[in-house]
Amino acid sequence: MLSAFFKTAHCALRNMPIQTDLVGKWNFVSSENFDEYLKEVGVGWAIRTIATKTKPALEFAVNGDEWTMNSNSTFKNYTLKWKLGTASDEKTADGRDVSSVFSIENDHLVQIETGKGGGKDSRIERYIENGKLVIVCTCNGVKCTRVYEKAA
């Protein structure tokens, strides 16, 4: 019984760093292969053109078991709320309808988007590397990487 408690406590503590490190404001630094990723998930030319020129600022917050991500840019302001392990329907910033489930795997915040109405599935991983927020989006083998730095 006691060993089960320590195993659970260890897992909970192991999952905390991404939660604490992610909280706060992040400024856009760079993007690689974003247009190809957006094309693969089915985003049209006009939205892709705008989205690839946009440099959103992100802000993450955690309140109890609810997470929030705000994305603010000249193109669009977007808020996403979730609880780990719970599926939630959302309309993505680029207009796709998906069902998302978030989890923590190896200190990465992982979002699995399941496309609705014929939409494509996607995997989005967010993690901290060398003090920067790295976001890797993958759909059908097409991968993009976006990098942010913590706001002062």
From Swiss-Prot:
Binding, a fatty acid: 126, 146-148
GO CC list: cytosol; nucleus
Keyword terms of this UniProt record: Lipid-binding, Transport
Name this protein carries in UniProt: Fatty acid-binding protein homolog 9
PROSITE patterns per UniProt: FABP
UniProt-listed InterPro entries: Calycin (IPR012674), Fatty_acid-bd (IPR000463), ILBP (IPR031259), Lipocln_cytosolic_FA-bd_dom (IPR000566)
Membership in a protein family: Belongs to the calycin superfamily. Fatty-acid binding protein (FABP) family.
